[in-house]
Regions:
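Secretory targeting and sorting signals
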Residues: 2-27
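Blade/loop signatures of beta-propeller domains
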Residues: 34-68, 105-108, 201-203, 350-351
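A short beta-strand motif characteristic of beta-propeller blades
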Residues: 69-74, 118-124, 162-169, 216-222, ...
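Beta-rich, blade/repeat-based domains predominating
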Residues: 76-90, 102-109, 124-145, 169-187, ...
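Short loop/turn segments immediately following the C-termini of beta-strands
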Residues: 97-99, 146, 192-194, 244, ...
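A short loop-to-beta-strand structural motif that recurs across blades of beta-propeller domains
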Residues: 107-112, 150-152, 207-210, 248-250, ...
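Short loop/turn segments that connect beta-strands within beta-propeller blades
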Residues: 114-118, 155-159, 212-216, 253-258, ...
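Loop/turn-rich, solvent-exposed surfaces of beta-rich toroidal or solenoidal domains
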Residues: 247-248, 252-254, 259-263, 267-302
Length: 351
């Protein structure tokens, strides 16, 4: 998952949206569902928030040592996933999936907010989300929403919900899991079946990666077994996807128009590859669901070190803080899920 704010000229996030306007700028009560609004096309303005990665900057090793440990901020959540840093407000959003199930045997999910150093509150109740990303203008979060088997956008100002991708050729997705957005608004997302519940399979047993461009959904790859974490390289020319049930990480060449070309293996073995982010040097940080570590790889796929969170079943990562050198880590042990952080040498991207 990765929006690249270092590219100054944006054509915006062009989405086919179905939303419901709430009062502009109004904070919604924690118990209120996000509103839905009428279909329209959203286009972000030119420009981007202050660049995370200065042009021409040189970076050394990303980790202070070959193996480092993160510090626990708080535990006791249900199951945290999908952290995304919101620079304008100075806070982190993340999905918290309940241990129980709702209708159709599907996990309910709430978006929590963490404002450093120690404040937590509910940002969107009943969000139905897993992985989160940012729109190019940073005014919306783009969410893989398993509750409606689609990809949604939530406006930060009033939490209004929109539909980014409803289906593929009239067939419902399994349960979208993770998402990334290119600086020109092209959206990529993974669709395993982890949270499909007892809803019917409309994908003929396939678990896939999809792309959304100009409101049109197209297939990237349906050969992967349970695709999970997804990210773009800093220049947007490489798409990384973790295949959870294959214990492999793949990479795809991304063309200027957002279409994908050749696929190759990036990392041949990582136990349960889950969420991922990248830093300004192009290093890749991948959460492993099997060993609870964050594995750090160079752009060439060489392992540079590991980060231990202390939590079991590490789920996802995102850079945050004023200088983007704080790596936030979510762990997903059911009913004892936690948020951790560690300071690193290289700044990175907010999801």
């Amino acid at each position: 998952m990765t929006w690249r704010p270092t590219i100054a000229a944006l054509t915006g996030l062009c989405l086919a949206l179905t939303t419901a306007a709430g009062p502009a700028g109004a904070a919604l009560p924690a118990s209120r569902d996000a509103p839905h609004v009428n279909a329209h096309t959203f286009t972000g303005p030119p420009g981007a928030p202050p660049g995370v990665c200065p042009e021409g900057a040189a970076y050394g090793p990303p980790l202070p040592a070959g193996s480092v440990s993160a510090t626990k901020i708080r535990s006791g959540f249900s199951f945290l996933e999908g952290p995304v840093w919101i620079a304008d407000g100075g806070y982190l959003l993340m999905s918290d999936m309940a241990a129980g199930t709702g209708p159709n045997n599907v996990q309910p999910s709430t978006i929590r907010r963490f404002t450093p150093p120690a404040t937590f509150d509910t940002f969107i109740a009943d969000a139905g989300s897993n992985g989160l990303a940012l729109s190019p203008d940073a005014q919306q979060i783009i969410a893989a929403t398993h509750d409606q088997r689609n990809v949604s956008a939530y406006r930060l100002s009033d939490r209004a919900r929109s539909t980014v991708a409803a289906d593929h050729q009239g067939r419902a997705f399994n349960s979208p899991n993770d998402v990334t957005v290119r600086s020109d608004g092209v959206v990529y997302f993974t669709d395993p079946n982890f949270q499909r519940g007892n809803r019917p399979d409309q994908m003929s047993g396939r678990t896939s990666v999809f792309r959304v461009s100009g409101g049109q959904v197209s297939l990237v790859d349906d050969r992967l077994r349970q695709p999970n974490g997804i990210a773009l390289s800093p220049d947007g020319s490489t798409l990384y996807v973790g295949a959870y049930s294959e214990n492999k990480i793949y990479k795809y060449v991304v063309q200027p128009d957002g279409s994908t070309g050749a696929r190759s293996v990036f990392v041949n073995y990582l136990g349960g590859p889950d969420g991922v982010t990248v830093d300004c040097a192009g290093n890749v940080y991948w959460a492993s669901g099997s060993d609870g570590l964050i594995h750090v790889y160079s752009p060439a796929g060489a392992q540079l070190g590991t980060i231990r969170s202390g939590g079991a079943g590490t789920t996802n990562v995102a850079f945050g803080g004023p200088d983007r050198q704080t790596l936030y880590i979510t762990s997903g042990r059911t009913n004892d899920s936690g948020l951790y952080s560690v300071r690193l040498n290289v700044p990175g991207y907010p999801y």
